[in-house]
Amino acid sequence: MKIVVTGTRGIPNIMGGVETHCEELFPRMVERGYDVTLIRRSNYVKDDLHEWKGVKLVTIPSPKKKSFEAIIHTFCAINEAKKLGADVLHIHAIGPALLVPYAKLLGMKVVFTHHGPDYDRDKWGFAAKTILKMGERMGCMFADDVIVISNVIKNLIARKYGRTKNVHLIYNGVSEPEICDYPEYFKELGIEKGKYILGMCRFVPEKNLHHLVEAYRQLIVKNKKLIEQGYKLVLAGDTDFEDEYSLGLKQMARENGVVLTGFIKGRKLHSLLTNCRCYCLPSSHEGLPIALLEAMSYGVKVVVSDIPANLEVGLPKDDYFHCGNVDELSEKLGKIIEAPLQHVDYDMSKYDWDQIADEVGGVYQGLKK
């Protein structure tokens, strides 16, 4: 069965939640006997790969302009999928889903994965938000099957579009943690094991990393001994499009002694997750955050905003703070630093990528009927 995937910037080693999702899922689909081709956006690709872990990679041009790169690339990708003779076109995210009707007009079977209402993201203006809402509508109304990554999204599309048939709740997953140390890297960053708060995500407004930096600033102003003791805030990530927000965030971080790692993967990231005091995700918008699940898989104490997507993870009440309340966040971080270093045994059973791949395979097989 030939599957063609679009709606992602690409794999491997490309920043983003959808990208991480695809990087984990589709090699597993190949292992299950599917012929998978994933179409990448040229401006994010830094390699000349044509295949990765069995997934065929086709790279086609796209304009690196956030307002319309996804839609133009998806149009080209659908035409490519038709040429390749796809049995199923799997479209990710609501922006690319705007073209689900076009794919249906070409006679294709379409699976649409809804990763979250992206029109809630702070970075989009009115026109972009309108197009994203239209994309959500087109995907939910015309795709043969819809995969949602949380109950929040499942309830959303039932309420807005009455879509309940062939809607499949399949969570994001997380891989087994790779517990490791990396003394040379820690020396380079100037940090110590167990003495840093970790923020790990893209530098975009809705992640609210500026709130985390401000909470850290308040913390060290109240207790200057924390600096003497070596406690720091580490932000792991970057942005696809350097803009006023990301530049301002980096400046704010540097002024407050925050460690900026840039976009990292592999041993560097694993060592930061292994040894952090806690992980913090203060965002105002999420689908089902893979970064949070990844931190949980390492048994890390977490502090997250109380938005619906984070609440669905089902953490203890004390792990949440009111979204946007910097004082409350700062207070919680202070208590975590004062308490003994914790290892938390979370139940990660429903976030197993192999189980997820089996469930996605069931969706594909249903299209044969």
Report each predicted region and the residues it spans.
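Conserved donor-binding/catalytic core segment of Leloir-type glycosyltransferases
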Residues: 4-6, 190-217
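Membrane-proximal helix-turn-helix segments that form the acceptor-binding/catalytic region
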Residues: 79-82, 105, 129-146
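Short His-centered aromatic/hydrophobic patch
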Residues: 91-96
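A short, active-site helix/loop in glycosyltransferases that binds the activated sugar's phosphate group
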Residues: 140-168, 174-176
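Nucleotide-activated donor-binding/catalytic signature segment of Leloir-type glycosyltransferases, i.e.
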Residues: 246-264
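Aromatic "clamp/platform" in nucleotide-sugar-dependent glycosyltransferases that forms part
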Residues: 284
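Short hydrophobic beta-strand element within catalytic cores of glycosyltransferases
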Residues: 297, 301-304
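Conserved acidic donor-binding segment of nucleotide-sugar-dependent glycosyltransferases
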Residues: 318-327, 334-339
